[in-house]
Every structure is written in structure tokens, then in C-alpha cells.
Amino acid sequence: MKNLLNISDLNQNEFEKILQFAEDLDSKTEQPLTNKNIGLIFEKNSTRTRLSFQVGINQLNGNFIDVRFEELNLNRFESYEDTFEVMSCYLDYLVFRTTDHKKLELAYKYFKKPIINALSDISHPCQAISDIYTLKENFGTIDNLNIVWMGDMNNVLFSLLEVVDFTKNTKVDVFTSMNDKKDKEKILSKFQVNDKIMSVTDEKSVFMHCLPAKVGSEVTEDVIKGKKSIVLTQAKNRLVAQKGILKWLSI
């Protein structure tokens, strides 16, 4: 049974299939989710991930059911085992966004049907797939790229680092804080992406951000609104990436 909890759950062939499915579904209509019910549980707030899954499921002719985490009896007396086993009686897939990866692992243990990690505290495979799709779309390949990560170490970075195993001669440099919570904002200000930083990059370089961005803190407005910024394309590609993932699960 297929699941997507982490990028490391995939082999290179599966990863490339998802990218190919995403590319195909960007230009043609398919209905692999006909008569399928997909539950969406979002413990954390979401704009791009939620909407891209909802629209993607609709476009693939599936049904999505929003399950409010705060309304589940998990907060009172019902166990994760009972909750997810019951959900598996009604749903075909589960898309789960959570504050704690351990909750995702419990869902995987008890739901016993395909699960997609829509973000946890240590992993964001959907974002990584979308980002790599965007890089491939922009450069024609994901091989032989120099990728620099600026800012805090987070779930997106951890997932992107796992993707490097599927590339050839791609180098990743990480310029990041050590995540000292006490002085985090002060420390991270040293890693702001601004015109000075972008001026030393290659002529064909691009700026990406998973959004939402703290403009004026993480990145200047000149950069995120500038010619090298492809953040809107990156956000748009969340839709085709989610569709590629969903099709991969369906076959």
C-alpha cells in the first residue's frame, strides 16, 4: 500500500513518476479519483496546501471531506486507534496536516489506507515535490543545480534534503540559524534575502519561498516582488503537484 509520509518513503522511480503525473495533469484532464472519498484533517492553519488539495481532488473527480481536528473526540476521551480505524471505514485516502509527526505515525498505523502528509513538524513532502517540479519546469532539469537555503532549519528543508538523493551533481548549501528560540528573530535577521544577496547569484538564478513570507524580515519586498522571484509560480504548482501525488496513490 502506498503512503507519502516522507520523501524517503519513495524510491527514485516513484518520485519521478509523481513529477511526470503532475506535468501530464497540468495540461490534460483525468478522473482517477472517481467515487473516492478523501478526508482532509488540518490541525494547523493552511491556505495553499488546503486549497490545492481541495481543488485538485475536485478536478480529479473525487470527493473531499473536511474533518475538523478540534471537533474530534481525540481532545476528550477517544483514542487515536479508534478514531482512525473508524475513519478507514468511510474514507479511501487521508490527507493529514499536524503539529506532531508522531500523530501522523499513529494515523498510518491505524488508518491502514493511503495517507498523505500535508505537513508535520519534521517533514513537508508535498512542498518539496512542488518545489522540485517548479525547479525542473524553470531549468529543464533538477540535476547540476546549486541550491542555497537561507533561514531557519524546518520541515521543508528536511524534505528537500531527502530529494537530493534523486539528483545528479546537485549541491545544497545551508545558511541557517541554530534555532535558538530565545533570540530567534534577531539571529534570523542575519539571513535575510535582499538585493545584496541576490546580486552575487547567477544571472539565471531564482528566488523561491513556500509562503507565507515575513516580508521585511525573511526577505525584502524588492526581492519577493522582483524579476527573479517565482513564488507565485511555485504556489500555483502546488495544485499540479498534489494532483500528481493523488494520481500516484490511485494506481
Question: Where are the regions a protein language model picked out?
Answer:
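Rossmann-like adenosine-cofactor binding region
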Residues: N179-D222, K228-S229
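Glycine-rich phosphate/diphosphate-binding loop of Rossmann-like nucleotide-binding domains
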Residues: E43-V55, E137-K182
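Active-site cofactor/substrate anionic-group-binding motifs, chiefly glycine-
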Residues: N37, F42-Y90
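Phosphate-coordination loops involved in phosphoryl transfer and adenosine-cofactor binding
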Residues: P32-I38, D143-L145, K204
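Anion-binding alpha/beta catalytic cores of soluble intermediary-metabolism enzymes, centered on
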Residues: F84-M87, D92-V163, H209
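Positively charged, low-complexity intrinsically disordered leader regions
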Residues: M1-L51
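Short, structured coil segments at secondary-structure junctions
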Residues: L60, Y90, Y110-K112, T201-E203, ...
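C-terminal helix-to-coil terminal segments
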Residues: E221, K225-I251
